[in-house]
Design a protein with these regions (language model features):
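Non-catalytic DNA-recognition/assembly elements of restriction-modification systems
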Residues: 1-3, 7, 12-13, 53-81, ...
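Conserved hydrophobic residue
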Residues: 13-14, 43
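Terminal amphipathic helices with adjacent charged low-complexity linkers/tails
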Residues: 21-25
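Sequence-specific dsDNA recognition surfaces
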Residues: 51-56, 71-88, 102-132, 151-152
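Short, well-ordered beta-strand elements within core beta-sheets of diverse protein domains
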Residues: 58-60, 163-168, 207-213
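Extracellular/lumenal ectodomain signal focusing on beta-strand-rich modules
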Residues: 72, 145, 208-210
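Specificity-determining recognition surfaces
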Residues: 97, 182-211
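A short beta-sheet element
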Residues: 100-101, 119-181, 194-195, 200-202
């Protein structure tokens, strides 16, 4: 499975198509959208990061791909509320869920009905409300753990141990999920993170991390191919377990 992900994010899993719109075009659209949101006061302008140096690039990219920092790919990266903003007595059962790293399982959100707050508290913390299309990421513990926000989780809240990422509407979040799942990307974040008893990932580390970005059309082909290969892995593992049990 690790090999499949590594080949996928290095452009070695599906053939390139010269007719695909280059990744640089998508990056221009993202930049224009960020500029619009900044001008409207909806997001803040990030502090500029350094240009990508040649020695930072871990491998050579196929034609049409681009190296990009997460800062230039995300519309917005937000950290969950400080622990002081939510107290133990604020928790109720079956209220508005708070999403912490332990609730991110296999790219899905599995919430705990005991980790929820009243609607009034959720309104107070509305700046941390999740929207359809967002991704939530762990910033404590298992670095690289993530989940997709669907219609069911719209309006739920990012917890104190998490980030949430807002993406441009045309971005393929499933491809970004492949990058977050790749062992090389996770090891990079782990190596940059701080903490002795528990790993802590800060915004600067994540925003500075590099993504190998294919053309949008190729991203879709890669995701489809990876999903098919992972299903095959599941079937082979299930067959092996069945044979071992007999």
């Amino acid at each position: 499975r690790e090999l499949i992900l590594t080949l996928a994010v290095q452009g070695k899993l599906v053939p390139q198509d010269p007719a695909d719109e280059p990744a640089g075009v998508l990056l221009q659209k993202i930049r224009a959208e960020k500029d619009r949101l900044i001008a409207e006061g909806k997001i803040k302008r990030d502090k500029p990061l350094a240009e990508i140096a040649e020695e930072e690039k871990p491998f050579e990219l196929p034609v049409g791909w681009e190296w990009v920092r997460c800062d230039d790919y995300f519309l917005e990266l937000c950290t969950g509320p400080f622990g002081s903003m939510i107290h133990q007595e604020d928790y109720v059962r079956d209220g508005v869920p708070l999403i912490n790293p332990s609730h991110m399982v296999g790219g899905r959100i599995i919430h705990d009905p005991r980790v929820t707050i009243k609607a009034a508290d959720a309104e107070r913390l509305s700046a941390y409300a999740l929207s359809v299309g967002d991704m939530v990421l762990a910033r404590r513990g298992e670095v690289g753990r993530f989940a997709y926000v669907t219609q069911q989780e719209h309006g739920w809240l990012c917890g104190t141990g998490s980030f949430f990422v807002r993406l441009y509407s045309q971005c393929n979040r499933e491809y970004l999920g492949l990058i977050f799942s790749d062992v090389r990307f996770r090891q990079h974040l782990q190596g940059e993170s701080v903490g002795t008893t528990m790993t802590n990932l800060n915004q600067r580390i994540l925003l500075n991390a590099l993504l190998a970005l294919p053309p949008l059309a190729e991203q879709s082909r890669i995701v489809t191919r990876v999903e098919a290969l992972m299903r095959l892995c599941d079937a082979l593992e299930a067959k092996g377990q069945l044979e071992a049990a007999q």
